[in-house]
A protein has these predicted regions:
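A short interface-forming secondary-structure element
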Residues: 30-48
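A short amphipathic beta-strand at an alpha->beta junction
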Residues: 60-78
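N-terminal, polar/charged subdomain of small-to-medium soluble alpha/beta proteins
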Residues: 1-6, 10-14
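Preference for short coil/turn "hinge" residues that link or interrupt alpha-helices
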Residues: 7-10, 36, 57-59
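Short, non-transmembrane amphipathic alpha-helical segments
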Residues: 4, 43-65
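Short edge beta-strands and adjacent turn/loop segments
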Residues: 11-36, 73-78
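A domain-level signal for the structural core that forms small-molecule/cofactor-binding pockets
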Residues: 49, 78-81
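Short acidic, gly/pro-rich beta-turn/loop elements at beta-sheet edges
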Residues: 18, 41-45, 81
């Protein structure tokens, strides 16, 4: 869970991760994340990049099989001026 949140928080296009859930199955894990995206970014591109990075890094760092990564964009953050 912490690895997934750290990956998202290091992406400039992601404002905040609001929820993360990891379910462990016998043959691997499933990750569910909700995030707020910064205004001006293509949501689909950001979510695809986050999904790929999360799967790759968790498999690399933990040697666990990631079965799926489900992402939900819960909102858009607009900078206050």
């Amino acid at each position: 869970r912490q690895i997934a949140e750290q990956i998202a928080n290091n992406m400039p296009s992601v404002y905040e991760v609001t929820r993360t859930r990891v379910e462990n199955y016998g043959d691997g894990i499933s990750i569910y994340m909700e995030a707020i995206i910064n205004y001006g970014n293509n949501i689909i591109d950001v979510m695809q990049e986050l999904k790929n990075k999360t799967k790759k890094e968790i498999e690399k760092q933990t040697a666990m099989n990631v079965l799926k990564v489900d992402l939900v964009a819960k909102g858009i953050h607009m900078e206050e001026e």
